């Protein structure tokens, strides 16, 4: 525990947060007491495998997003990686751009002396961003789509030493079109490995590739993530080109769980046991320490007749963290760790992933069947048919077909029970807490891989009434 306390101690110079005089209506995503401690903008890094997504995040934030043993060994991202970074701008108007922009880790002070020779200015904190590092492997497409659900903007990475587009590049671009992401920066990475003429050629390829897509007209920035070349230019673009997304702090708080874990070590004394921790992205509202919360669908059970019952979990927030920064309240943006009093066995090994956490009695319904209006891609992305330059055609949805459905941060199986025109009914393998108007992504199994085939919007469905135990809140 001492190390954790020491790490929190590093934050002496961060702005203090005080719950007693918190006025939510006056909060903005750029309030000093908010951006001092937590990120308020989510930026996804997307692109083909091994094009340098995680390296770019490390160059900006200093954080290695590849954390798990099997990821490190294979040098690929499997789970969603998160890293927060503070972006500063020198307050001396004579400090030339782009050197007047710099980035550092989330736990650093809000003001730093300018590093340029003979500059008397100070770097002031202007943005606090969270990078959602998505996997580029086609097999991990579901994880990528879960990431797309929480992004405000995207960095599309294209390696300079390979032809453009690579299969996952086009698949990811389709995914961010589904999620209606408008803010995109294109990074031409590994520029140190190629000649200038190659870089110009590839620049033409990239502009041609993004024509007619959501990324058309997006700035293309040449960088080298390994050598940290042009990272200051990227910081300048993030500040000037990506607007701060509008947030509704007065809405009921809602967090989609992307990770959950049990922080207790084996052999821990019963008196020292800590409750489970849920990590996720807040979509709306403000979560506060001491607040009573509900997690839906909660504990899902099936009886011998196949009937599903859901028991929402009730608890209280005991702590909030953004990386190593302790919070009194958390707003949308970045990955927030929520320490609760939930039985840790319910949280261990990502058991709560795909669930929704929020204020008691203010969460949406739990759906077992969804009625959607859907749109299919014309061709499969990243799958070539023999002798054909274009992708394989996407077949229509068949009755009783099994698809992979992505709703928020949940990936679950779904069986098509009926289809007519562009409408379909899907019976889900696991119930989901969602609402009408939400977007979902549909993937089909092709050649042993789940491939994105289209998306849909929920307009109805069959809900489950949750079972509430007699003692509603476990305090």
From Swiss-Prot:
Compartment annotation: Cytoplasm, Cytosol
E.C. numbers: 3.6.5.3
GO cellular component, one term: cytosol
Residues that coordinate or bind GTP: 50-55, 189-192, 224-226
GO annotation, biological process: cytoplasmic translational initiation; formation of translation preinitiation complex
Protein name in UniProt: Eukaryotic translation initiation factor 2 subunit 3
Top-level taxon in the UniProt lineage: Eukaryota
Signal sequence interval, chain numbering: none
Subunit-structure text: Eukaryotic translation initiation factor 2 eIF2 is a heterotrimeric complex composed of an alpha, a beta and a gamma subunit. The factors eIF-1, eIF-2, eIF-3, TIF5/eIF-5 and methionyl-tRNAi form a multifactor complex (MFC) that may bind to the 40S ribosome.
Region (G1): 47-54
Coiled-coil blocks: none
A GO MF term: GTPase activity
Catalytic activity reported: GTP + H2O = GDP + phosphate + H(+)
Residues in tr-type G domain copies: 38-247
Keywords recorded for this protein, A-Z: Cytoplasm, GTP-binding, Hydrolase, Initiation factor, Nucleotide-binding, Protein biosynthesis
Gene (name only): eIF2gamma
Family: Belongs to the TRAFAC class translation factor GTPase superfamily. Classic translation factor GTPase family. EIF2G subfamily.
Region (G4): 189-192
Function, as annotated: As a subunit of eukaryotic initiation factor 2 eIF2, involved in the early steps of protein synthesis. In the presence of GTP, eIF-2 forms a ternary complex with initiator tRNA Met-tRNAi and then recruits the 40S ribosomal complex and initiation factors eIF-1, eIF-1A and eIF-3 to form the 43S pre-initiation complex (43S PIC), a step that determines the rate of protein translation. The 43S PIC binds to mRNA and scans downstream to the initiation codon, where it forms a 48S initiation complex by codon-anticodon base pairing.
Region G3, annotated ranges: 133-136
Enzyme superclass (EC): hydrolase
Region G2, annotated ranges: 75-79
CDD domains: eIF2_gamma, eIF2_gamma_II, eIF2_gamma_III
InterPro entries assigned to the protein according to its UniProt record, in alphabetical order: EFTu-like_2, eIF2G, eIF2g_C, eIF2g_dom_2, eIF2g_GTP-bd, P-loop_NTPase, T_Tr_GTP-bd_dom, Transl_B-barrel_sf
Main location as per UniProt: cytoplasm
Region of interest: Interacts with CDC123: 456-468
Region described as G5: 224-226
């Amino acid at each position: 525990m001492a190390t954790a306390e020491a790490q929190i101690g590093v934050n002496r110079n961060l702005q203090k947060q005080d719950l007693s005089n918190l006025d939510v209506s006056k909060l903005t995503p750029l309030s000093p007491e908010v951006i001092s401690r937590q990120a308020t903008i989510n930026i996804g890094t997307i692109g083909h495998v091994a094009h340098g997504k995680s390296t770019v995040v490390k160059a900006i934030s200093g954080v290695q997003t590849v954390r798990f043993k099997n990821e490190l060994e294979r040098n690929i991202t499997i789970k969603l990686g998160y890293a927060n970074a503070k972006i500063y701008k020198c307050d001396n108007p004579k400090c030339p751009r782009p050197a007047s922009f710099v980035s550092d880790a989330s736990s650093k002070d809000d003001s730093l002396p300018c590093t340029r020779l003979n500059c008397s200015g100070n770097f002031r904190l202007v943005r606090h961003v969270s990078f959602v590092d998505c996997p580029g492997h086609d097999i991990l497409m579901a994880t990528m789509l879960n990431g797309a659900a929480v992004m405000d903007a995207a960095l599309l990475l294209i390696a300079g030493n390979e032809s453009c587009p690579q299969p996952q590049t086009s698949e990811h671009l389709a995914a961010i079109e589904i999620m209606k992401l408008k803010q995109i920066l294109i990074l031409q990475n590994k520029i140190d490995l190629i000649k200038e003429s190659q870089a110009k050629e590839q620049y033409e390829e990239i502009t041609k590739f993004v024509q007619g897509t959501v990324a058309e007209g997006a700035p293309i920035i040449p960088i080298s993530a390994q050598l940290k070349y042009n990272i200051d230019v990227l910081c300048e673009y993030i500040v000037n080109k990506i607007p701060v997304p509008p947030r509704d702090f007065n809405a009921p708080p809602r967090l989609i769980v992307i990770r959950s874990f049990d922080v207790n070590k084996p052999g821990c004394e019963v008196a020292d046991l800590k409750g489970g921790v849920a990590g996720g992205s807040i979509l709306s509202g403000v979560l506060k320490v001491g607040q009573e919360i509900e997690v839906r669908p909660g504990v899902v059970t099936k009886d011998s007749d196949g009937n599903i019952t859901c028991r929402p979990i009730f608890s209280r927030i005991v702590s909030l963290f953004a990386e190593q920064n302790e919070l009194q309240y958390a707003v949308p943006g970045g990955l927030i760790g929520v320490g609760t009093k939930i039985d840790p066995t319910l949280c261990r090994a990502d058991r709560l992933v795909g669930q929704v956490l929020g204020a008691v009695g203010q969460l949406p319904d739990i759906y077992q069947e969804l009625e959607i209006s859907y749109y299919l891609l014309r061709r499969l992305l990243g799958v070539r048919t023999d002798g054909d330059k274009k992708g394989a055609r996407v077949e229509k949805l068949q009755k009783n077909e099994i698809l992979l459905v992505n709703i928020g941060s949940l990936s679950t199986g779904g069986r098509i029970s009926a289809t007519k025109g562009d409408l379909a009914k899907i019976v889900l393998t696991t119930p989901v807490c969602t609402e009408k108007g939400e977007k979902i992504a549909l993937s089909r199994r092709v050649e042993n891989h789940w491939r994105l085939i289209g998306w849909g919007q929920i307009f109805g469905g069959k809900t489950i009434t949750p079972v509430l135990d007699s003692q509603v809140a476990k305090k």
